[in-house]
Amino acid sequence: MQFSKFGEKFIQDSPILQLMDDLGSALNSDTPINMLGGGNPANIPEVSAAYEAALQQIAASGAAIESVSNYASPQGDAKFIKVLVEFFNRRYGWGLTSDHIVLTNGSQNAFFYLFNLFAGQFCDGSHKSILLPLAPEYVGYADVQVEGSHFVSLPPIIEKTTHEGHEGFFKYKVDFDALENLEELNNNQIGAICCSRPTNPTGNVLTDSEMAHLKQLAKKHGIPLIIDNAYGAPFPNIIHTGASLEWDDETILCFSLSKVGLPGVRTGIIIAHPKIAKAVSNMNAIVNLSPVRFGAAIATPLFENDEIIRLSDELISPFYKKQSAFAIRRLQEEFADYPVYIHQPEGAIFLWVWFEGLPISTTKLYQILKEQGTLIIPSEHFFVGMQTADYPHAKECIRLSIAQDDHTLDQGIKTIGEVVRQLYHN
């Protein structure tokens, strides 16, 4: 049997496939596994109870059965879109209309659309790429483009820092000197700029100043700035440093219901210029007919009365801040006298750990830890759009999920400590 080039692209091994396969294997395993590698959000009992109440409410009202027994338009559930318009205008005064919002079957679906809209071959014969202002970035971006992989990214400025008075931390910053002199940007070979904020995998939050600079660059070159806000404000608000949220017609904001604790409903939200929203809606019609409505049905009452804000601010964000503090303490206990650094824990549901001068790559470390019942994600695949052969830092980091209970975090970090200390000694 032969597949097309399109088919061959999507059946080959890829980092996101590895991540999801390992997640599935861990969830179905009879052997206890310290699952520090996946992107699944935590099960927070009080949050789950709120969703159960919302489910009961829509079941009693008939909204649940109505949502699964009828298609939405390709744009998405009309009632939820109306509620979202009111929600964002109430909080930010952006002057949105329903034409500015389109729903997708999760954020991954949204970025498949957006990255194929703004990168690849254009009608005039030119080829353009997506610019990621710094790597590492979300591994799920890497393989979504139909025609090859069209990404350009730059290594970050690495600044060693302190956190709450403690040494052993660092922060990534955008290298704007390199960015402004980037050949592809200045030769009209970039179709859009994209960043996640907070960043998956590092928890980095680009500062307001950095975001303003990126916006200015995008405007200068006549391209959109895409912001992946899956972990940001106002929901799930897993962000532990000051950061404002801005939008205009030249910005594309992407949200998700996944990290508020509803990954299974596969609901993504795009806020963009109506022309872009319409293009995504058309793609929905061809690829999916229409987005799934069930997530919209659950979420509608939570956005109508701002319950989603209470859940985010009072339960979700504090939970991850607590887990972050616990994991940091354990990592510093395990590596007190080793060249191990943690990225500033500014947000998201991960910690990014740098083993400076590690004798092996973290891809090999991943295999060793996997055999010992602990799953992490190695760093190399997160450097999307970058050549890493001569960049050792790209092979020295791991992503740890903090969406686990204390026992799993403790045992997983203990195993990592034992293995990595031995590697340094050898």
Located regions from the model:
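Conserved glycine-rich beta-strand-loop-beta hairpin in the small C-terminal domain of fold type I
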Residues: 314-328, 340-354
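Conserved core segment of the aminotransferase class I/II
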Residues: 127, 146, 247-321, 418
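Conserved core of the PLP fold type I
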Residues: 66-221, 226-248, 252, 423-424
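Short, conserved charged micro-motifs
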Residues: 359-365, 407-411
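Short, solvent-exposed loop/turn segments at secondary-structure junctions
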Residues: 39-43, 108-109, 137-140, 198-201, ...
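N-terminal "arm"/small-domain region of PLP-dependent enzymes with the aminotransferase-like
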Residues: 1-75, 86, 90, 221-223, ...
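PLP-dependent enzyme catalytic core of the Aspartate aminotransferase-like
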Residues: 78, 82, 86, 90, ...
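Short beta-strand
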Residues: 33-35, 254, 340-346
